[in-house]
């Protein structure tokens, strides 16, 4: 069996906030925020090319026991399966939804791998790729 690739963890608030401006990939089980690090950021943190992952489970998902269970499932899915798909010098934040607890583990890992591999679905600046057409005059006026 292949040894899983080492994935470092995001732990500081500033690291999580930096990803708010990154690309967002939405799914039914979680939201994935992705951002490539600059060389300067990698050297400052002394982490090199390794990918980093952070996990967020809000209180909306339940009490501490439920939130920790969701976080453990996501960590294991990244460690065993999805970590192989992570790009070097990239940070990922996984914001869990309630369904991440009840979904089969195989679906969780498949969805996570698919979202990690998908590139450029959104611009990351909160804007849509195509602008909506301007509204014309109402009733010909």
UniProtKB/Swiss-Prot annotation:
Its EC number is 3.1.26.5. It is an enzyme of class 3 (hydrolase). Keywords: Endonuclease, Hydrolase, Nuclease, RNA-binding, tRNA processing. Residues 114-134 have a biased composition (Basic and acidic residues). It catalyses: Endonucleolytic cleavage of RNA, removing 5'-extranucleotides from tRNA precursor. It comes from the Bacteria. Pfam families: Ribonuclease_P. One of its GO terms (molecular function) is 3'-tRNA processing endoribonuclease activity. Residues 114-141 are annotated as: Disordered. The keyword Iron-sulfur does not apply. The keyword tRNA processing applies. One of its GO terms (biological process) is tRNA 5'-leader removal. Consists of a catalytic RNA component (M1 or rnpB) and a protein subunit. RNaseP catalyzes the removal of the 5'-leader sequence from pre-tRNA to produce the mature 5'-terminus. It can also cleave other RNA substrates such as 4.5S RNA. The protein component plays an auxiliary but essential role in vivo by binding to the 5'-leader sequence and broadening the substrate specificity of the ribozyme. Belongs to the RnpA family. This is Ribonuclease P protein component. The gene is rnpA.
